[in-house]
Amino acid sequence: AMNVTEIGSGEGPLVEEVRRLVGPKVPIAVALDFHANNTEQLVKNANIICGYRTAPHTDEEETQERAARLLLRCILENVLPECVMVCPPLLFPGEMITTEVDPCKSLIAELKKAEEKQGVWTASLFGGMPWCDAPNAGASVVVCGPKGCKEPTDEAKRIADLFWKEREKFGFEEKAMSPEDAILWAQEREASPIFISDSGDNVTGGAPGDSAYLLSLLMKHECKNVLVAGIVDRPAVEAFYLSAEGEEKKVKIGKSIDSKSTETEVTGKLKQKGFIERGGSKDIRFALIAVGGIDIILTDERCSFTTQKNIEETGAK
């Protein structure tokens, strides 16, 4: 779902340039995110397109391997497949289209049925990326197979039709509330842990991750035993990096990237500082601070916290 200023879709021009360099007789295989916003420019220049089949994503390596194996098949069989794309007029936020529950779960199963058909090498369904303000934002079904076979087109149309027919059944798997209502709801519950996801500032969805809006509400309601993971604020991290653990400092948090975001002033006590490992290198600095009963992980770069390990490496518990 890459979108580049003055270019538009990033993947299409990138693959088109690869095609220009390698020529028309070299196979090209592409592995894509489930939320890809696909274009005809991409489809006509790739021979193999494989998409993740999980959202949340747990099959990245499996998808890359599938694309690599099909690329090898192209070479061994001396075949140049082509891709067919059908785009139903649908655009869902990611929270409404998860693959662990129906109707999306059943649609993913249809991909495997399609691949049992002669003439179909691989089939992929894409939910699209709604937060990308682009003409190509939206759902798509891409099926690949040898040139001249009608099955890829037939299966792409069939699955896209099913996608459209099931459109009214998509909904939020978890409770959807306003931020303040979510906090009040959580305060009334004895069970723990309770996760509140700020879908409006979701780093994995392309957002800056610098909003302190939820933090300001948590402070307003004097919440205790809460972890905010995390907020991007390089100046705040740098300020605490000059402090010793246990030292208090008054800083403004938030609005460090997006001028339209929310900031709030806090007096925080430094609990721990260090580096967060991402992509095999420890290159993101963090500061774990305490503000009353709220712990906050501050980072100097955009950083998602999607696993328990991500959180524990900051010293937060």
Q: Where in the sequence are the language-model features?
A:
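Core alpha/beta catalytic barrel or barrel-like domain that forms the active/cofactor pocket
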Residues: 1, 31, 35, 82-85, ...
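Conserved anion/nucleotide-ligand pocket segment
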Residues: 64-68, 72-112
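Hard-cation-handling environments
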Residues: 95-301
